[in-house]
Regions:
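ATP-binding N-lobe of GHMP and related small-molecule kinases
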Residues: 1-96, 115, 119-124, 151, ...
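ATP-dependent small-molecule kinase catalytic core of the GHMP/sugar-kinase superfamily
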Residues: 2-8, 13-31, 119-234, 247-278
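Short, basic/glycine-rich phosphate-binding loops at helix/coil junctions
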Residues: 48-61, 109, 131, 196-204
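A broadly conserved amphipathic alpha-helix scaffold signal in soluble, globular proteins
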Residues: 73, 108-114, 128-131
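Active-site acidic-Proline motif in GNAT/NAT acetyltransferases
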Residues: 91, 97, 101, 250
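DPxDG-like acidic metal-binding loop motif
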Residues: 97-123, 139
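Conserved glycine-rich beta-strand-loop-beta hairpin in the small C-terminal domain of fold type I
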Residues: 241-244
Length: 278
């Protein structure tokens, strides 16, 4: 039996512009994915009987719906590997907060089992498999902070400043489907180029108004972060919510701000990274 452990990082969207709605119901977007050094840890024990089992995970999700299992089964189906695996996860990334935890977990499973099952598939193939599981999976498969277009799968790696981020969860959840079907969802139809975002200050998240209308506490969290000392820019929401974040140049300032959070919220400080540890 082979045992191995892999990290699965969180991400934030430094901005998220919805450019159009597609005929298939998905939305085209432009965004900057920033990876963080705040990670789940996933452990793998290989099996020679072909079975895929979840030993430890989110008990609120049945195993068949868990991206840990779905990604392993998708890879097994594609590769026809005779091997199996037992999977366990130690979760740190808040679920359903726009931090990409589930997508990151799926990507880490694909990357890990590609190695452990000795499949030798390239990352583009793994990303194509990942895209069938979720639009954010490919960015974690390629493992780079990136400028993204399409539904999030057209990626251009980019090196971003390695700031420290205070990320706050209000411990509430909004489904992505609720956001994208909400009447308050805004759009930014003008296509921008990646160079524009080095000089424009109008970075925003088109999902914010819809999210606030569903969970007004997001607005309170943004206001609180904007009141902290020594932060670099306006606080923003990541993904479709509900987590919000603000950047600091110095870790100590982020840690001071974390101590000032209301006790009903969960917060963590993480540094931006441009390459995934997965």
């Amino acid at each position: 039996m082979t045992d191995a452990s892999y990290l699965s990082p969180a991400k934030i969207n430094l901005f998220l512009h919805i450019t159009s709605k597609r005929a298939d119901g998905y939305h085209n977007l432009q965004t900057l994915f920033q990876l963080l050094d705040f990670c789940d840890e996933i452990r793998f024990s290989l099996r020679d009987d072909g079975q895929i089992n979840r030993i430890k995970g989110n008990e609120d999700i049945v195993a068949e719906d868990d991206l840990l299992i779905k990604s392993a089964r998708a890879l097994k189906k594609y590769s026809n590997s005779s091997l199996g695996v037992d999977i366990s996860i130690d979760k740190k990334i808040p679920a359903g907060g726009g931090l990409g935890g589930g997508s990151s977990n799926a990507a880490t499973v694909l990357l890990a089992l590609n190695e452990l099952w000795q499949l030798n598939l390239d990352r583009q193939t793994l990303a194509d498999i990942g895209l069938t599981l979720g639009a954010d999976v490919p960015v974690f498969v390629f493992g780079r902070s990136a400028w993204a277009q399409g539904i999030g799968e057209i990626l251009e790696p980019i090196n971003l400043p390695q700031y420290y981020y205070l990320v706050v969860s209000i411990n509430k959840h909004i489904s992505t489907a609720e956001i994208f079907s909400h009447k308050a969802l805004t759009m930014t139809p003008v296509q921008r180029k990646i160079a524009d975002f080095s000089r424009l200050s109008d970075l925003h998240n088109d999902c914010l108004d819809a999210a606030i209308s569903l969970q007004n506490e997001i607005k309170q969290a943004l206001k609180h972060l904007d009141s902290t000392a020594n932060h670099l820019d306006n606080a923003r929401m990541t993904g479709t919510g509900c987590c919000v974040f603000v950047a600091f140049e110095k870790e100590k300032d982020a840690l001071v701000a974390k101590k000032q959070l209301p006790e009903q919220w969960f917060g963590f400080v993480a540094q931006a990274i441009n390459t995934s540890p997965a």
